[in-house]
């Protein structure tokens, strides 16, 4: 998948139609993947059909205001009405806002927006919006000037959220660092922005695939996987990071799950060799390649290198090793590497296409 072959005007009709198509593909895949077992066929068919029946119905659910919510930092925020002007200083929440169809309400987004392909593909106009800064240095002046009704911030900017509240700007902290927290984040943002029905459809789409994928790879071997970080092959994600969920959802085992760091952890070559993973998966935005690892003499004794089981996550659209709504597609991709007999490349590409057509309004190219 590389560039969009065409853009679509996103509307409710397209949303319902593409969501139904996306879910139908999930249903067909589940039935085909389990074709070797009659009992498995029946159970998977019933589960998938039930989910399809629910998810193909998109309900417009209104929110009553005033609305009081608790954000993912435990802060209480009250809204008198649905926000009309929205800012985001976190690419995770910005991508989510696009998935909820709120690009026209954005008045400011995080720094380096022009480096994110998803923005150029789904909503090119937002790239030129005022810069709200980074997770390390928030641009309070620009935010005040943009006068948003709400600004979404990462957990690292919790103190900034309190500062903004003192300036009269509603601030909501999000922290989607595992599958349940991502679901909670989608629900929270959907409720605040009066998009509950679409948020539910998004969550249901994600949950349906993950449930089906669990069925499809159950009973298979569980390969050990080392996830190499963006900065270096010697950085990785432990059990407290979303990337751990990415691997387990793909039917793999994170060799670094013993680590409890809440950010990328630095490890040694010796530690990687001791873990001796079956596969090495490189983060999407890494500045090095699979060939760099395959040619690294320090890793010559690693099973993943010996067997040439080293891959890099796609980054044509967005980094699926981050907790964006489409991150479950990263699990599909990894599953297609770990379990190619159960998760085909064609299915992976179809899921990517249907998901972005349904929730972001563009068709990726193959």
Per-segment meaning from a language model:
Residues 1-11:
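Short, Lys/Arg-enriched N-terminal segments with co-localized hydrophobic residues
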Residues 72-74, 129-141, 260-269:
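Short helix-initiation/N-cap motifs at beta->coil->alpha
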Residues 10, 17-18, 23, 33-95, ...:
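Bacterial Sec-exported substrate-binding components of ABC uptake systems
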């Amino acid at each position: 998948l590389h560039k969009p072959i065409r853009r679509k005007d996103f509307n409710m009709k397209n949303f319902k139609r593409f969501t139904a198509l996306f879910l139908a593909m999930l249903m067909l895949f589940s039935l085909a993947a389990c074709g070797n077992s009659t009992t498995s066929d029946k159970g998977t068919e019933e589960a998938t059909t039930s989910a399809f029946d629910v998810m193909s119905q998109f309900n417009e659910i209104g929110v009553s205001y005033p609305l009081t919510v608790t954000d993912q930092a435990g802060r209480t925020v009250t809204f008198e009405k649905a926000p009309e002007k929205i800012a985001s200083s976190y690419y995770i929440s910005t991508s989510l806002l696009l998935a909820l169809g709120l690009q026209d309400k954005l008045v400011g987004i995080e720094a380096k927006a022009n480096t994110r392909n998803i923005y150029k593909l789904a909503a090119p106009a937002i790239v030129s919006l005022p810069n709200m800064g980074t997770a390390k240095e928030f641009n309070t002046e620009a935010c005040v000037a943009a006068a948003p009704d709400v600004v979404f911030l990462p957990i690292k900017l919790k103190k900034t959220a309190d500062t903004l509240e003192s300036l009269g700007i509603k601030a909501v902290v999000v922290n989607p660092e595992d599958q349940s927290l991502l679901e909670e984040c989608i629900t929270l943002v959907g409720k605040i922005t009066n998009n509950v029905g679409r948020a539910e459809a998004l969550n249901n789409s994600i949950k349906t695939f993950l449930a089906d994928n669990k069925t499809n790879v159950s009973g298979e071997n569980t390969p050990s996987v080392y996830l190499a970080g963006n900065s270096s092959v010697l950085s990785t994600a432990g059990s407290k990071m979303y990337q751990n969920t990415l691997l387990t959802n793909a039917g793999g085992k994170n060799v670094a799950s013993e680590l409890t760091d809440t950010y990328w952890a630095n490890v040694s070559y010796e530690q990687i060799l001791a873990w001796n993973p079956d596969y090495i998966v490189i983060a999407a935005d890494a500045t090095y390649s699979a060939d760099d690892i395959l040619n690294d003499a320090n890793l010559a004794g690693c099973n993943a290198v010996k067997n040439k089981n080293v891959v890099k996550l796609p980054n044509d659209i967005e980094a699926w090793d981050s907790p964006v709504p489409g991150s479950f597609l990263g699990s599909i991709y990894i599953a297609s590497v770990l379990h190619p007999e159960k998760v085909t490349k064609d299915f992976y590409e179809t899921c990517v296409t249907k998901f972005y057509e349904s929730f972001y309004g563009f068709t990726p190219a193959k």
